[in-house]
From Swiss-Prot:
Enzyme Commission code: 4.2.1.20
Annotated catalysed reactions: (1S,2R)-1-C-(indol-3-yl)glycerol 3-phosphate + L-serine = D-glyceraldehyde 3-phosphate + L-tryptophan + H2O
Organismal lineage: Bacteria, Pseudomonadati, Pseudomonadota, Gammaproteobacteria, Pasteurellales
Function according to Swiss-Prot or TrEMBL: The alpha subunit is responsible for the aldol cleavage of indoleglycerol phosphate to indole and glyceraldehyde 3-phosphate.
Annotated GO CC locations: cytosol
Pathway in which this enzyme or protein is active: Amino-acid biosynthesis; L-tryptophan biosynthesis; L-tryptophan from chorismate: step 5/5
Active site, per annotation: 49, 60
GO molecular function, one term: tryptophan synthase activity
Pfam families reported in the protein's UniProt record: Trp_syntA (PF00290)
Gene behind the chain: trpA
Keywords: Amino-acid biosynthesis, Aromatic amino acid biosynthesis, Lyase, Tryptophan biosynthesis
Family: Belongs to the TrpA family.
Protein name as annotated: Tryptophan synthase alpha chain
Quaternary data: Tetramer of two alpha and two beta chains.
Organism: Mannheimia succiniciproducens (strain KCTC 0769BP / MBEL55E)
Keyword Cell wall biogenesis/degradation: no
Length: 268
């Protein structure tokens, strides 16, 4: 059984939801980023969603854009990101790891080369943020060739065909976006039709649904789970803690530990 399937089976058996933090690899630099990721896992993260630094991210709001810039300014390349992932996988052989990145970074490695490298490291899933489902077939084929699970976003304005396509082609988990726009911890509004989308995705046998965008507080995790999703992803709120503590690494780790514990507690 693949890692995400194993995780969701374990969570279901314990009647828990999942909490999945997102951070950008190498933010604010390679060494501190490893400490940060270890802190997330050690304090209750059920899985990791990790981003590759990119100069022009499509869906990212100002907080995660700044994280990308910090990582790039620290000299982080795709090769360095893969090195960091190797280190994380070596320390945590069981935790599911999903990547979120833009297509240009994959093309720079070639499709086959990128997914082969992911498989060598032990990455579980890849979500390509700027490739719509209609153009995704080459990515799906390359991912499956190397045993990587392709993940797709279900946007809040998805029609029936989009919901069906996302459900059929996603593996590992399904990413449900809370609202239109870019990532943000400040904008915590959620689209009014999320309940309906959850029902539709489940009707089409989608993989377990993780809700992201604007998830910054434990109460929002509870609300997401009450709607029927399997867990919640928190990116901007996690990265804001890094941003607020760039000059105090120990406080950064302590604040992240408290944040993850509180968010995970909301899933119990």
């Amino acid at each position: 059984m693949a890692r995400f399937e194993t995780l969701f089976a374990q969570l279901n058996a314990k009647k828990q939801g999942g909490f999945v933090p997102f951070v950008t690899l190498c933010d604010p630099d390679l060494e501190r980023s490893f400490d940060i990721i270890c802190t997330l896992v050690d304090n209750g993260a059920d899985a990791l969603e990790l981003g590759f630094p990119f100069s022009d991210p499509l869906l990212d709001g100002p907080v995660i854009q700044a994280a990308n810039n910090r990582a790039l300014n620290a000299g982080c390349s795709t090769a360095e990101s893969f090195k960091l992932l190797e280190k994380v996988r070596s320390k945590y052989p069981e935790i599911p790891i999903g990547l979120l990145l833009c297509a240009n970074l994959i093309y720079a490695q070639t499709l086959d080369g990128f997914y082969r490298r992911c498989a060598e490291i032990g990455i579980d899933a890849v979500l390509v943020a700027d490739i719509p489902l209609l153009a995704a077939e080459p990515y799906i084929q390359a991912a499956k060739k190397h045993g990587i699970q392709p993940v797709f976003i279900c946007p809040p304005n998805a029609d029936e065909n989009t919901v069906k396509g996302v459900a059929e082609h996603s593996e590992g988990y399904t990413y449900l976006v809370s609202r239109a726009g870019v990532t943000s911890a400040e904008n915590q509004s959620h689209a009014a039709n999320l309940d309906s989308l959850v029902e539709q995705l489940k009707a089409h046998n989608a993989p377990p649904i993780l809700q992201g965008f604007g998830i910054a507080k434990p109460q929002q995790v509870k609300e997401a789970l009450n709607m029927g999703v399997a867990g919640a992803i928190s990116g901007s709120a996690t990265v804001k803690i890094i941003e607020a503590n760039l000059d105090n690494h120990e406080k950064c780790l302590a604040d992240l530990a408290e944040f993850v514990k509180n968010m995970k507690a909301a899933t119990l």
